[in-house]
Regions:
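Short, conserved "active-site rim" segments that organize catalytic pockets and cofactor/ligand binding
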Residues: 2-21
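Short glycine-aromatic motifs
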Residues: 20-28
Length: 230
């Protein structure tokens, strides 16, 4: 039985995971609620970290230190940057970058982190398994893309900002946790992957799109996760 840590940022994302879990129990650590249970034959520990990079990094280290997870999966919603993505499409993060990390004053590219580099790569085996799981699903009214996910402590509603991130990093979507989780896992040598479903469009009304589609995005990620864990 594999022991897998799953991180989400919001309540809608958490509920979608709990809907597919069995034998759920709770453990409180530092004011955070970790839910343990099973999906298929896998032991699962899922936690809602809250929004942002520090919150995400914090729970990642707790999952590794306290629960001894063998891999970490981050699922949830993201905003599209690529014009090729539509609401509900899935992005499997091949590599991640912190678009707001800036030490360009020291002659490094934006996004470069000392001791880490710029792009952090997800585990190749996990990528291939998630691609297979996504393609096994009967629903085909959405695209599945392996690509680049950008992370920053900004909820991007400004079209100009989104275009700059897309242009600079060639990122497919943007969110607020994934690359922080990736950095902790990279430093701790723990396999990880980030899966995002598009909840707002690159040129639409992001706040309206997000509120309307976040539940759909969360359920779609949960369905792919369940297929992956079979």
């Amino acid at each position: 039985m594999s022991k897998i840590g799953i991180i989400v940022a919001m309540e809608e994302e958490l509920e979608s995971i709990l809907d597919i879990m069995d034998n759920i129990e709770e453990k409180e650590i530092y004011g955070l609620t970790f839910k343990t249970g099973q999906i298929e034959k896998n032991k699962i520990i899922v936690v809602k970290c809250g929004v942002g990079k520090v919150n995400a990094a914090r729970v990642t280290q707790i999952l590794i230190d306290t629960f001894n997870v063998k891999c970490v999966i981050n699922v949830g919603a993201a905003g599209a940057l690529s014009p090729l993505l539509n609401l509900g499409d899935i992005v499997i993060g091949e590599k991640l970058i912190q678009h707001d990390f800036d030490i360009t004053a020291f002659d490094h590219d934006k996004g470069y982190i000392t001791g880490v580099g710029d792009y952090i790569y997800s585990d190749i085996e996990l990528i291939e398994k998630f691609k297979k799981a996504a393609n096994n699903l009967k629903e085909k009214d959405y695209k599945i893309k392996t690509g680049i996910i950008a992370t920053g402590d900004i909820f991007c509603t400004d079209i100009e900002m989104k275009n700059k991130i897309f242009s600079k990093f060639d990122a497919d979507c943007v969110e607020m946790e994934g690359a922080a989780i990736a950095q902790v896992c990279y430093l701790d040598n723990i396999p990880f992957i980030v899966i995002r479903s598009i909840s707002d469009s690159p040129n639409g009304n992001n706040e309206i799109d997000f509120d309307k589609f976040v539940e759909l995005a969360s359920k779609r990620c949960a369905n792919i996760l369940r297929e992956f864990l079979k």
